[in-house]
Amino acid sequence: MDFLTLMENKLDEGRMITFEEAVELAKGKIEDEKLFLLADKLCKKNMGRRVDLCSIINAKSGGCSENCKFCAQSGHYDTGVKIYPLLDVDDVLKAAKENEKEGVHRFSLVTSGKSVSDEEFEKILGIYSVLRKETNLKLCASLGSLSYERAVRLKEAGVSMYHHNIETCREYYPKICDTHTYDDRINTVKNAAKAGLEICCGGIIGMGESMEQRIKMAFEIRELGVKSVPINVLNPIKGTPFENVRSLSPDEILRTIALFRLIMPYAHIRYAGGRMCLGEHQSKGFKAGVSAMLVGNYLTTVGNKISDDLEMIQRMGLEI
């Protein structure tokens, strides 16, 4: 019995693969198509055929105190990004309703900065209260570092999921940021989970890390009990330290997605920022383990039209 069949049998029995097994799967001895086929089978079995759709609004942009080397919104780099304060409730509500009309299931406010001020947080709570009354969207939040007390208040305001990426694995984290620690990110995830919020936590691939380090990130995310795992592909931004990083090939991106699916068989593996790097191969992700997708525009880059994404999903025989 070959190694891939052994892994398939193990996953069929509801058991989880180990780090060593995932590294073995990643070595390239197994044909991509066979790996994708197993990831797709596992995805459809555990997650069904309905693609979970979310959208975001850049509710506060630029001027961030942190020095994450990939980020256009860091105040440490000259990227030409727009800088503006927290949006008013009317602007957010308008965007939310437009996204809901397009068929989106989830909607999140995303703010720049390590965290938001007390005044901003109170305003954000008010915005979520309005969104809960005026839409049927599931509400998510991505407000940076979060205390347990704030997490409780977000849940009371109607937020069901908190997004906070670990970005990369623990050992590679010092290569991407040194104004806060990897453990700061872990603590935020744990605070949100303790308050009863579902967790959306993933990272960025293509920042110079190895495939083994991506696998380490996946296992670190798995340990956190995450429900949604956004996979972003680095979109090198001019002015950031990572502006000249080599782009990943479509095959490497898809192989990473498939491995994440095998490592986390019961979580949503979510297409997120940078999937445009796949070009005409974007639809292949839905045959390699993707079960969810961030649609519309991203924080500082433009995405596909939502209608084009919906058409792609339907073309793949999936549901919305």
Curated annotation (Swiss-Prot):
Positions contributing to [4Fe-4S] cluster binding: 64, 68, 71
The protein's annotated pathway = Cofactor biosynthesis; biotin biosynthesis; biotin from 7,8-diaminononanoate: step 2/2
The record's section on SUPFAM superfamilies has: Radical SAM enzymes
Q: Please indicate which superkingdom the organism of origin belongs to.
A: Bacteria
Q: Which cysteines are joined by disulfide bonds?
A: none
The GO annotation for biological process reads: biotin biosynthetic process
Please list the residues that bind [2Fe-2S] cluster: 108, 140, 200, 270
Q: Which reaction does it catalyse?
A: (4R,5S)-dethiobiotin + (sulfur carrier)-SH + 2 reduced [2Fe-2S]-[ferredoxin] + 2 S-adenosyl-L-methionine = (sulfur carrier)-H + biotin + 2 5'-deoxyadenosine + 2 L-methionine + 2 oxidized [2Fe-2S]-[ferredoxin]
Q: According to the record, how does the cofactor bind?
A: Binds 1 [4Fe-4S] cluster. The cluster is coordinated with 3 cysteines and an exchangeable S-adenosyl-L-methionine.
Q: Which UniProt keywords apply?
A: 2Fe-2S, 4Fe-4S, Biotin biosynthesis, Iron, Iron-sulfur, Metal-binding, S-adenosyl-L-methionine, Transferase
GO molecular function terms listed in the Swiss-Prot or TrEMBL record: 2 iron, 2 sulfur cluster binding; 4 iron, 4 sulfur cluster binding; biotin synthase activity; iron ion binding
Q: Where is the Radical SAM core domain?
A: 46-275
Question: Needs which cofactor?
Answer: [4Fe-4S] cluster; [2Fe-2S] cluster
Q: What EC number(s) are associated with this protein in UniProt? A: 2.8.1.6
In the record, the note on similarity to other proteins reads: Belongs to the radical SAM superfamily. Biotin synthase family.
Q: What does this protein do?
A: Catalyzes the conversion of dethiobiotin (DTB) to biotin by the insertion of a sulfur atom into dethiobiotin via a radical-based mechanism.
Report the protein name in the record: Biotin synthase
Q: Which organism is it from?
A: Acetivibrio thermocellus (strain ATCC 27405 / DSM 1237 / JCM 9322 / NBRC 103400 / NCIMB 10682 / NRRL B-4536 / VPI 7372) (Clostridium thermocellum)
Q: Which gene encodes it?
A: bioB
